[in-house]
């Protein structure tokens, strides 16, 4: 009986240790996703600063920082694969892993868009061409980054209402992008020698629009994590009523 009791205690201790290990693994995934989000936000901010200040060094720092964002995405993918292979996750944990993978891919794309902006900024600066104004690009960047920050906040605080509020704001970013397109086309007409420069500005504007799209995607993913519901479907039903 004594030996049986010891064996039972050892089994219980083993189970508790395993649960603690799995909990730490999940927290590592969550932590790395937040680190990736912070780096993606910083990258987008720096990309705008490089453009506004015509600063090659800042642009270079954005480009160099993209490798770290990519590395964290790879690490999250590996952690999720390892967790699933070690145990069959319960529904809630499985949703977290699913969202972590999808959100990390969106954040990786945010880093790519910021890098694209930095490279286009360098291209404009290296041509020694001057550009007159940035249109509504700074406003777009501010709105896109606020959406991204709030999407991450909804994940940290587990607040589906925050995720819900983000949807629809991407339409404001889309509208700003259309304004930019019209303005930059007019600037091309006014000064045909600057066609290449303002073509780059059109692409930069489009990159910030895409960053907002990725923020919207993350908010939808977080909403699904917290409610098991499709945010698109919820909003569609709300629109009908």
Regions found by a protein language model. Name each.
Residues 1-17:
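N-terminal amphipathic/basic-hydrophobic helices that include classical n-h-c signal peptides
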